[in-house]
Amino acid sequence: MAKVAKRIKNIRKDVDFNQLYALNDAVSMVKERAVAKFDETIEISMNLGVDPRHADQMVRGVAHLPNGTGRNIRVAVFARGDKAEEAKAAGADIVGAEDLFESINGGVIDFDRCIATPDMMPLVGRLGKILGPRSLMPNPKVGTVTLDVAGAVKASKGGAVEFRVEKAGIVHAGIGKASFGVEKIVENIKAFASAVIKAKPQGAKGEYIKRVAVSSTMGVGVKVDPATVRSESV
């Protein structure tokens, strides 16, 4: 316990939890304090001025991170025939139809993202109670119900990150690893923030991005000046 307390004290040292830091400074501070024995994930959390209980204030979309996430994303694809072959050629980890349905229905979910061709959705829809709560249900709004399965697979493998606002008006995502350079993490954060801004619903009133914080898996959260996460900021 003493070692844990000392580690927590060290990572909290010199962090003013009441201050809003510029994005670059916040990322540097988080990286410096990511001292676990594994490559910690760098995460962003954004508090939005929306009430997702109202349909016209739902925020959902996909962000394409220019430097990837640092994770090996396993992709499952529901497709038949030529589309199934395209998915395999693009690097999909699992490709199937009724066989994939039976596997998932039986509790085997060993993938991080699920893609389907439109004709497969009547079958996939029956898995809603399993895939929905895990945010794995294919959806045309985020490009996971598509005829371009090859493009969707490559995007998923290359750094596409889905986001969806939670009940408290928060969106969050892993946007890189502590081993990434500060510049790469900043680029990823700005790409994520840009996608969230573009997804602003018509029903949102007043200030949209209210609070932003950056953290690592085992580290502290550092508050960020929201103005510095916009793509045009430096």
Swiss-Prot record:
CDD domains: Ribosomal_L1. Keywords: Repressor, Ribonucleoprotein, Ribosomal protein, RNA-binding, rRNA-binding, Translation regulation, tRNA-binding. It comes from the Bacteria. InterPro entries: Ribosom_uL1_bac-type (IPR005878), Ribosomal_uL1 (IPR002143), Ribosomal_uL1-like (IPR023674), Ribosomal_uL1/biogenesis (IPR028364), Ribosomal_uL1_3-a/b-sand (IPR016095). GO terms for cellular component: cytosolic large ribosomal subunit. Pfam families: Ribosomal_L1. One of its GO terms (molecular function) is rRNA binding. GO terms for biological process: regulation of translation; translation. Belongs to the universal ribosomal protein uL1 family. Binds directly to 23S rRNA. The L1 stalk is quite mobile in the ribosome, and is involved in E site tRNA release. Part of the 50S ribosomal subunit. This is Large ribosomal subunit protein uL1. It comes from Bartonella tribocorum (strain CIP 105476 / IBS 506). The lineage of its organism: Bacteria, Pseudomonadati, Pseudomonadota, Alphaproteobacteria, Hyphomicrobiales.
